[in-house]
């Protein structure tokens, strides 16, 4: 994947403002609320019975932070995303059996969270760069499935 200097700047510039714990928790909670069938992968997280329960669930919050922290690795390694996510792809495919479509859904949710938190900075050009990034990450995570 080729990244222009402008795309790299738009991605890293916004990423520097992201609160990984808060945005990660919000993104994962939104995924579980908007796409309730994704909850089956998180049965060990306890109470996911309502939006209030999901938003207040410390395991959702912790895993959301973990997910977004790992997304930060993509931002740091824009030119090597495929290898950056090789082990995570294997884990999600072989051990967790996560439907790879969920990676695309989470990417779309992350775009919404970023737009909500950084409306002024989230220009159409910024959105285009981030949309490209979440697609590349989703593809890298789904790689082991092919």
From Swiss-Prot:
CDD domains: Hb-beta-like
Pfam families reported for this sequence: Globin
Binding site for heme b: 63, 92
GO cellular component, one term: haptoglobin-hemoglobin complex
InterPro entries: Globin, Globin-like_sf, Globin/Proto, Hemoglobin_b, Hemoglobin_oxygen_transport
Keyword annotations of the record: Heme, Iron, Metal-binding, Oxygen transport, Transport
A single GO BP: hydrogen peroxide catabolic process
Superkingdom, taxonomy of origin: Eukaryota
Keyword Flavoprotein part of the UniProt annotation: no
Subunit and interaction comment: Heterotetramer of two alpha chains and two beta chains.
Function: Involved in oxygen transport from the lung to the various peripheral tissues.
Protein name (Swiss-Prot/TrEMBL): Hemoglobin subunit beta/beta'
Taxonomic source organism: Chroicocephalus ridibundus (Black-headed gull)
Lineage of the organism: Eukaryota, Metazoa, Chordata, Craniata, Vertebrata
């Amino acid at each position: 994947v080729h990244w222009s200097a402008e795309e790299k700047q738009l991605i890293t510039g916004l990423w520097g403002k992201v609160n990984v714990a808060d945005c990660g928790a919000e993104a994962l909670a939104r995924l579980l609320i908007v796409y309730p069938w994704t909850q089956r992968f998180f049965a060990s997280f306890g109470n996911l019975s309502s939006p209030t329960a999901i938003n207040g669930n410390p395991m959702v919050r912790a895993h959301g932070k973990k997910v977004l922290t790992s997304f930060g690795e993509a931002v740091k390694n824009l030119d090597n995303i495929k290898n950056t996510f090789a082990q995570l792809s294997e884990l999600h495919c072989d051990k967790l059996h996560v439907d790879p479509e969920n990676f695309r859904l989470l990417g779309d949710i992350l775009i919404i969270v970023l737009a909500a938190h950084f409306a002024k900075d989230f220009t159409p050009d910024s959105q285009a760069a981030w949309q490209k990034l979440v697609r590349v990450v989703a593809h890298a995570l789904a790689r082991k499935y092919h």
